[in-house]
């Protein structure tokens, strides 16, 4: 079985078009994580708070971010996919986030093959409501976990997301290539 983090390239035209490996599903509370040692998707925990993922959430292959994990990506989808699904996606924003004192930014992306998002190219193309719902989730999803604190610090544009992806690719190459 292929290792989706190490064997799959970052994307067909990274950083402009990336692969997003789905771990967590839109509308669910289950926090799945890809375990490269199995390799497969395992249930990490069920969110303690009564909140649900606002969209499909996972990681970018062959990336490693400042928090010591593969780079996180939230792909805006109308309907959930499944854990382990690989989505060809276009980065449109970077949500800058702090998780317990560590930088834990998230790439916000849209599916390349969904016509509903053909006109979404940058952070300004997202509605205020979309950004508010995403931020609300990430600011509250750990509220009922002991001694956990998260904060959304701001929003970067598509270029900031692409620059962060290139940074995560460089870190991956330094650590694992």
Curated annotation (Swiss-Prot):
Residues at which Mg(2+) 2 binds: 72
GO molecular function, one term: magnesium ion binding
Keyword Repeat among UniProt keywords: no
Binding-site list for substrate: 31, 45, 57, 141
Disulfide bonds: none
Subunit structure: Homohexamer.
Name this polypeptide is given: Inorganic pyrophosphatase
Annotated source species: Halobacterium salinarum (strain ATCC 700922 / JCM 11081 / NRC-1)
